Structures are given as structure tokens and as C-alpha cells.
Amino acid sequence: MRPLWRVSAIVLVLGIAGSVLAFQGGSFGVQGPGSFFSQGYSDDDSPSSKEPSEFYWSRLRYTSSTDLYSGYGGYGYGGSWRRDYPKADRQFLMALKRLTRIEARPTEQVVDLDSDDIFNYPWVYAVQVANWTFTDAEAKRLHDYLLKGGFLMVDDFHGTADWDRFMAGMRMVIPDRPVEDLKDQDEIFHVLYDIGARFQVPGEQYVYSGRTYEKDGYVPKWRVIRDDKGRIIVAICHNMHLGDAWEWADDPRYPEPFASMAFRVGLDYIMYGMTH
């Protein structure tokens, strides 16, 4: 644990570290996995889920090659789309409320590709995207969503095989746009926080093994796909697991620098998506 004077300095310089420490100290009211349902609310029936807001954290629900059940996996435990859900989403939303002036709904919104409802949400987050599969209609709807102003952030897939499977799905959606490696000076890293040197953000395996990578994903890849005008439409977080960092931010065993980096990146990506 950092000495208090060092913690105070980090809070003054970054702001975000204070949020991570608040998570770990319990001042956000987060007690651990499953605590969001301690009041008897299900995923989407809490009173706050009906509040009108200017921003909705939207998580993409998709069919996947590893679903335990048919279709979208429902709201049970099936479906790769729901990794870290909903705790990661809601802890990130608490940080968004604390650190920005965005009026965000405190609960997440699940969006599907089998309806046009996705067009109501300008920013969408997806995980475990090595496992996603699309019908032709779903791929076209996501294609249209991105080219009409939508922003997609993908996270939590690792290594060469995962990359190839992710790109197989992505090429159904955006077949003709190149994937680019982000540079330090790219605008998306300087919208809210100036993020210079970046490092690999590990998942929960770090707590148990000290290992930052999964599979053969040794080097973090910060990549994007842009539209014809240069706007980023897909932000790709490969060989890292930001969602786990958000989910584990309240656990003192998970190092603060990893959680702080994950929050800063997510906040910059949201601010970019909302302003471009």
C-alpha cells in the first residue's frame, strides 16, 4: 500500500487514482462480486435503470462460438459477451460520474444486433470478441452503426489465434478498412487525460499468478479502425483486459497502477466517442 502522502500526490496529479483508492476503501459502496444485487434488483430492473440520461454505458450482446446455451445466452451465465458483467460496467460508471460532468445512467444497457435499437447508443463496449459470430444481417447493422457515427470499443482477447478469430468477424462488418497501431500523439489519448507511456493491463490472473499476459499475448496492442474521414470507429484493446481492471478496482490485491491506466483509457475513449 502506498504511503498516504504519495497517495495524495497521485490524486492531485491524476484524479483517477483517488477513484481507485475510493473503490478499494469502500467509499463507493462496492463490497465485491455480486454486491450489486444485494438489494434484490436484477440486471435491469433497478429504479435507476429507468432514469433518462445523456450517456448510457452500452454493452454488446452477441452470439458466440462458446455459448453454453443457444441464442444470445440470455441473462443467465451463458454468453461470452457478459464477461465481468455487470460489475465492471457499474464500477466504471461510478468513475465516469466522479471524474467527468457527463450525466450517465448508473446502470448499464445491453444492446443487441438483431434490432435497430443499437442506433440509440453512440458508444458500445464488447468483450471476448474472439468468440463473436454474426449473421449477415447483424454484420450489416453493425457496419451501418459504425459508419453513421457509432463507436465500438473491444477488449479482453489475447494472442494470435484470438486475433485471427476477431478479425474474421470484423471483416464481415468492415471489410475494406485497415487496422492501425495507435501512436502516442493520437488525439484519443489526450481528450481528457494525457496518456503517454502505456503498459499491459492484466486480468484477474495477475492477482493469483503475477502474470500480466494470457496465451501468447505478451505485448499489448492499442489499435484502431478509422472511417474514410479519419474518425476512429473501432478501438481495439488486444492482449489486455481493461474490464477486469475496472471489476477488480475495489480489491486491494489488484495494483492501483493497472486500474488507473484502465480507467484513464476508458474515459478517454468515451470522451472521444462522444465528441467525434
How would you label these PLM feature ranges?
Residues 8-19:
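Bacterial N-terminal signal peptides
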Residues 89-93, 139, 143, 163-167, ...:
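Extracytoplasmic/secreted envelope proteins and their assembly/folding machinery
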Residues 102-112, 154-159, 177-185:
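Surface-exposed patches in mature extracellular/periplasmic domains of secreted proteins
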Residues 21-123, 129-130, 241-244, 248-276:
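Aromatic-Pro/Gly-enriched surface loop or interdomain linker
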Residues 100, 150, 170-177, 273:
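A generic secondary-structure signal for well-formed alpha-helical elements
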Residues 27, 32, 37, 65-71, ...:
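An acidic, glycine-rich "communication" segment
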Residues 1-6:
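Positively charged n-region of N-terminal signal peptides that target proteins for export
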Residues 57, 118, 123-163:
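Short alpha-beta junction capping motif
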